[in-house]
Amino acid sequence: MATVGMNDVKNGMKILVNNEPAVITETEYVKPGKGQAFTRMKYRFIKSGRVVEMTMKATDDVEVADVVDTDMRYLYSDGEYWHFMDPETFEQVQTDKAGMGGADKWLKGEEDCIVTLWNGAPIWVQPPNFVELKITETDPGVRGDTSGGGGKPATLETGAVVRVPLFVNQDEIIKVDTRSGEYSARVK
């Protein structure tokens, strides 16, 4: 495996920590007036999502993870596994619930996703930033409700629950931001 010095560590870089891949989310190079320089960094484990902060000497090295982000298309779920296909090579991979990382509640089929592969196996799935899903269940809007007032929970066709404005009704299609899980717009 390749190693990188602390001077070359950047945000978004994927490293190995205790034989588990992680993504660096923050780095700060500190040179105190007295003593040795050091780098303070935060990283998030890709599999578990756990965030850890670590301080390392400027002379230390970190191991770069052999992790590849691949554009793939979600095909279907058989209940136990979720199946993805590379649109260029038509190669298919499957992942379990742990590898989905919560993306399963936004996918219904034929969406383009970014699948993170480690040693050829998927360990993380990033859904598209926005998805359009149909509301299967929500309370009806009451006359006098305004768009500026509160909201109500709505169950989507994938089973996800999001808060929507009071004017949105059942069987309408809405646009949802998958990064925050929030309602974005109503689709006409």
Swiss-Prot record:
GO terms, molecular function: translation elongation factor activity
Keyword Cytoplasm in record: yes
InterPro entries: Elong-fact-P_C, NA-bd_OB-fold, Rib_uL2_dom2, Transl_elong_fac_P/YeiP, Transl_elong_KOW-like, Transl_elong_P/YeiP_cen, Transl_elong_P/YeiP_CS, Transl_elongation_fac_P
Keywords of the record: Cytoplasm, Elongation factor, Hydroxylation, Protein biosynthesis
Subcellular location, record wording: Cytoplasm
Organism domain of life: Bacteria
Record flagged with keyword Protein biosynthesis: yes
Pathway: Protein biosynthesis; polypeptide chain elongation
CDD domains: S1_EF-P_repeat_1, S1_EF-P_repeat_2
PTM annotation, UniProt: May be beta-lysylated on the epsilon-amino group of Lys-34 by the combined action of EpmA and EpmB, and then hydroxylated on the C5 position of the same residue by EpmC (if this protein is present). Lysylation is critical for the stimulatory effect of EF-P on peptide-bond formation. The lysylation moiety may extend toward the peptidyltransferase center and stabilize the terminal 3-CCA end of the tRNA. Hydroxylation of the C5 position on Lys-34 may allow additional potential stabilizing hydrogen-bond interactions with the P-tRNA.
Annotated positions of the N6-(3,6-diaminohexanoyl)-5-hydroxylysine modification: 34
GO biological process: peptide biosynthetic process
Primary location: cytoplasm
SUPFAM superfamilies xrefs: Nucleic acid-binding proteins, Translation proteins SH3-like domain
Family: Belongs to the elongation factor P family.
Role noted for this protein: Involved in peptide bond synthesis. Alleviates ribosome stalling that occurs when 3 or more consecutive Pro residues or the sequence PPG is present in a protein, possibly by augmenting the peptidyl transferase activity of the ribosome. Modification of Lys-34 is required for alleviation.
Protein's UniProt name: Elongation factor P
Gene this chain is encoded by: efp
